[in-house]
């Protein structure tokens, strides 16, 4: 899948730990996701900036006023944004997954090529 590649661990490469999360969906299926513990990332070292799209208060106020004047109804929805397919610009290293350590490559770490859940770069 090309999400990461195994590389030798050097003394100057900081690694991030990861964990699995498991969810039972409403249709009875199970879903597993690999999360990186991105809360250990330090701004200015591991990433430059983050962005969270937020609407201006005046824009929301205008939208609600216009909706009320037109006697329209509003429905709410949640849009989850995770940029998992974007190529990483920074070099980020993750420890190998517990229980999935590559045989004969125990001293290597995963260099992330794409974002994973939990990374600051994942949105």
Q: How does the language model describe each region?
A:
Residues 1-123:
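Long, low-complexity, charge-biased intrinsically disordered regions
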């Amino acid at each position: 899948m090309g999400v990461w590649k195994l590389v030798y661990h050097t003394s100057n490469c900081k690694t991030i730990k990861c964990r699995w999360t498991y969810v039972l969906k409403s249709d009875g299926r199970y879903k597993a996701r690999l999360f990186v513990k991105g809360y250990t990332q330090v701004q200015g070292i591991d990433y430059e900036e983050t962005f969270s799209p937020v609407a201006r208060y005046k824009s929301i106020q205008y939208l609600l006023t216009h909706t009320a004047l037109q006697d329209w109804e509003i429905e709410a929805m949640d849009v989850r944004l995770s940029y998992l397919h974007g190529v990483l610009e920074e070099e980020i290293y993750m420890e190998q997954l517990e229980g999935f350590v590559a045989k004969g490559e125990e001293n290597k770490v995963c260099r992330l090529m794409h974002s994973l859940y939990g990374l600051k770069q994942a949105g």
